Amino acid sequence: MRLVLLGPPGAGKGTQAAILSEKLGIPHISTGDLFRANIGEGTPLGIEAKQYIDAGKLVPTDVTARMVQSRLAEADAAEGFLLDGFPRTVEQADILADLLDKAGNPLDGVINYQVSEDVVVERMLSRGRADDNEETIRTRLGVYRDETAPLISHYGDKIINIEAEGSVEDINARTLEALGK
């Protein structure tokens, strides 16, 4: 299965992806992990991305897309993947669709983890990270809403909405049921 994971910060995407990866036998591909790996290994894409990050700029879509393309070409992703952190915009969704269509492997679905803002704030504050305060969290949620609302419309019938409140186990059971697993 080739799946994209969507959901606001604090929705539990990373937690669910780790469980789903094991249960479905497909890799969890996080763009954050890709950036860290490419920068850490000093790959040409990592060097290029680091220049933007060091300058306090967003890494351009084409650089991120090339990292994703390279990772999707690896053997363990041949039978499917869970993609987390890309796409974030309709432009990126179109780029991903082109990459997958050229490989003859279109996307199977888009899991959209839905959770209330208050639950997200509570979860993120309980993590105890220094940069997690309520104002910062609500700002991040606003950015997510602005970027992702068009993406959810764009994907239309590929969207699989999952209610992401409750225990990790309950959310995972709902996800697997929605995927027919």
Curated annotation (Swiss-Prot):
UniProt catalytic activity: AMP + ATP = 2 ADP
Keywords: ATP-binding, Cytoplasm, Kinase, Nucleotide biosynthesis, Nucleotide-binding, Transferase
UniProt keyword annotation of Transcription present: no
Gene3D superfamilies on file: P-loop containing nucleotide triphosphate hydrolases
Pfam families: ADK
Region (NMP): 30-59
Name listed for the protein in its UniProt record: Adenylate kinase
Species for this entry: Corynebacterium efficiens (strain DSM 44549 / YS-314 / AJ 12310 / JCM 11189 / NBRC 100395)
Gene assigned in the entry: adk
